[in-house]
Amino acid sequence: MATITDVARVAGVSKNTVSRYLNERGYMSEKTKSAIQDAIDLLHYQPNQIARSLTTKRTNFVGLVIPDVVQPFFATMASRIEDELDRRGYKMILCDTMHSPAKERKYLDMLTANKVDGIIVGSHSVDIDYSGIGLPIISLDRSLADDIPVVHADHVQGGHIAAEAFLKHGCKKVVQFVGYSKVLSPSAQRHKVFAEQMRDHGVECFTYELRLNQFEFSSYLQTAKMFLDQYPGVDGIFAADLVALAVQREALSRGRRIPDDLFVFGYDGSFVHKIAYPPLPTVIQPYEEMAATIVDLLERRIAGQTPEFHSYVIPVVSSESVPDEADGDPVGNYDLTVAPR
């Protein structure tokens, strides 16, 4: 296995010069940089990350804590965040808590013990003092503490978009499905706005709360069956994409026409709405913009800077306003300016 001494010998420079190159310290000519990199490539040299971290006080590892990697929203966000971290030279440690408070605590202890550079938290398992962890933290769609920045989609706008769709369709009796959560999440804003808009326009609106830790598609199908048995007169459903898909599938199996008899509108804009038939209209969350904002804020905190705002809110769009060629790439062709709040 090649050592730093071997690299220095092949490159014709000192060990100290190679060390400065690896740790990006001090001025160095492009010719010297090129010679060192050529030697590294030739020898397949791998720097000792432990020794390097002792010198730089950095590990270039970032932890991402999420409640369920199978859920389309979190799966998509994890992918986008990993891409963004990789582009900036970080490696991501994915921590899937499976909605377990005990696992969440264990993962946080592990990340802290391994001195990761920072943590991105999107888990909704337990309400603990994240401010006391002592590492740079950015929150994904969850209110953790006043001194921890949170990045989320504009759920108020999302609630309005969904409400307008139901009013336009002429629905008279609608139900929105709400996920159970022990902690405060900005995503709850969409449900509040949606219910207010429905009632302001004389539309009956009921809220159906999903059971704690109900996240499997099979359980959503069972819920859809029970729900349609209990509320046969409902003509509109508002839910996260995966839940909406389950309700739509069960309704179709009963001979309900979609959207004529039952108007189903989703929320998330993950791949789910594209595989649904009939097509599932939905509110598309800006995954790439959120990922870029989260990583940018985390880098600032790692550098010792204090972000200007506590909340960073990014606009959403309706799938019905997105051209087919942009479908599945929610923000690629849109100017979605980050709006601090």
Language-model segments: which ranges?
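N-terminal helix-turn-helix DNA-binding module of bacterial transcription factors
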Residues: 1-59, 333, 337-341
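Alpha-helical recognition/docking segments in bacterial nutrient-uptake
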Residues: 2, 60-164, 227-229, 233
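Short beta-strand segments enriched in small/hydrophobic residues
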Residues: 17-20, 54-69, 173-180
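Hinge/beta->alpha junction and helix N-cap segments in small-molecule ligand-binding domains
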Residues: 67-76, 94-103, 151-161, 177-225, ...
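Flexible loop/turn connectors
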Residues: 225-226, 230-238, 242-341
